[in-house]
Amino acid sequence: GVEGTLFARLNFSVGYFDKRSKDLLFEVRFPLSAGSYFDSDAIQNLTQYQNIGTISNRGFEIMLSGDVVRSKDWTWNLSFDATTLKNKVLKLPKGEDILHGQQKYSEGHSAYEWFTYHFVGVDQMTGKSLYELDPKQEAAAQAAGDLVEINGTKYTTSTSQALRKWAGTALPSVYGSFGSNLRWKDLSLSVLMTYSLGGKTMDSSYRSLMSTGSASSAAALHKDVLNSWNGVPEGMTATSPNRIDPNGTP
């Protein structure tokens, strides 16, 4: 890195980091054949923490700070810093991917990258959610009655046969802070504001509020539930080009 001072008022530093961590601790979920199971009252998927994998973290760090005002009684200092971070999984045991909830550890991808079901939209003829079909699960989808073909393209109404895709990373493109320190004699006032730009998050609270559950259960719901499908729109047919509403609510 490089650091310095200009005009006895402005301080700056620029740095680059590239850190590789080995034998990281990951939670590995065992398959059903190893005794893993699901209980509605308590999720008892058999897992084990293992020292596996190599991860790279690299990026730039920039820091600026300077005295805007500097006198016997008054001092006003402003500061700014920014950091970029690129995270990548470099090595996994046997090169095998590891699913972890809505994310997946995979060589060449970030450990914070989302790996989710690809939602296509709402079928305006039925009100059901449609997902891109995993070609390997077509027979299973057909047997379960979840296969839907619309204008020559096959979809599924169940995530069990849906195709998962990379959907961006939870890491911001850049993050940092702004700071202000104002001093008058022996009194001082400091303010620190943080920021982050980019990155995707999964709003689990919103997802929960959009789940109506059973009719007998009492729970708080989000007002967007009122936008749910409410019947076949006028003029809609099975072959309408706009049969799938990508912004619809099932």
Language-model segment annotations:
Residues Q44, S56, L197, G213, ...:
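Short acidic-hydrophobic sequence patches enriched in Asp/Glu that either
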Residues W184-S204:
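Glycine-rich phosphate/pyrophosphate-binding loops
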Residues Q50, D67-T169, T201, S208-G248:
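Conserved small-residue
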Residues G1-W114:
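Extracellular/periplasmic, surface-exposed regions of secreted and cell-surface proteins
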Residues G1-L6, Y16, I55-N57, G168-W184, ...:
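Outer-membrane beta-barrel transmembrane strands
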